[in-house]
Amino acid sequence: NRIMTEATRKKIVMWFWILFTTPIVLVIGLLASVWAFADIPSFEELENPDSKLATEVISSDGEILTTFHIENRSFVTYEELSEHLVNAAIATEDSRFYKHSGIDFESLARVLVKTLLAGDSSQGGGSTITQQLAKTLYPRETVNSKFKMVWIKLKEWITAVKRERNYTKEEIMNMYMNQIFFGSNAYGIKAASQTFFGKNPVDLTVEEAATLVGMVNKPTRYNPAINPDKSLTRRNFVISRMEQNGFLTKAECDSIQQIPITLSYQIQDHNAGIAPYFRDMLRRTMMAKEPK
């Protein structure tokens, strides 16, 4: 009886601590989750991101005289994108773009197997275009622990799924193209098109679109004005991916890969454009303090 009594007492103590600590652990976990995900943007914030768009000075006939900006970024609509840009981005960055809902588990599994078992890292990180767009909301420069990185990755996944539920694929692609940094003070595809080729995104050829898309993940390494040889190799890789994904025929691929990269390179700044005296006077007027 004494042994039974002692065993019963231990069970009572054990269940007491379980019942006592479980709510505390749950509350702590809930508070930690609220803290960890507190900065996940709302739908309104996703709808109206702080993109630091440039102020464009436009003449009466519709010509852009100059821009004033912190980041050289101008918005374009989906209809203003060359189809070659969209095709190149899908072929290179997210071949299953129209088949997943923000996270492509099939691609993640493939990348994991090839990276760990075959040692092949050429498949990239398995991030979808929607995930890459979400990454711009969570800077990683100051992250110095694996634990924080896991939290950030989880928040990126949640944000990516949230975007997929609220936007069409075309809207997501448009956001992506407007958000990418291409180096050379070019933020977004419009600034990049004008900086490197002196034209609007809708007018880009296949080889020009492939050059810009090739810069997405490493804008300095594959900058055609800085590293023309590396840029050409990368551009031709993008073109080959377009052929593999059915956007180009084999003959088109082989022909386009022979075309050299021809730039119309000009970094866009406040001094670029026509009517310099008018622009300077306008800048002074805009920056002048309102009299008290």
Spans of features found by a protein language model:
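N-terminal type II signal-anchor transmembrane helix
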Residues: R2-I58, R96, L116
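Generic surface-pattern signal
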Residues: F37, N48, L117-A118, P139, ...
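Generic detector of well-ordered alpha-helical segments enriched in charged/polar residues
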Residues: E44-E47, G62, A109, V113, ...
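Non-catalytic structural connector segments
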Residues: T249-K292
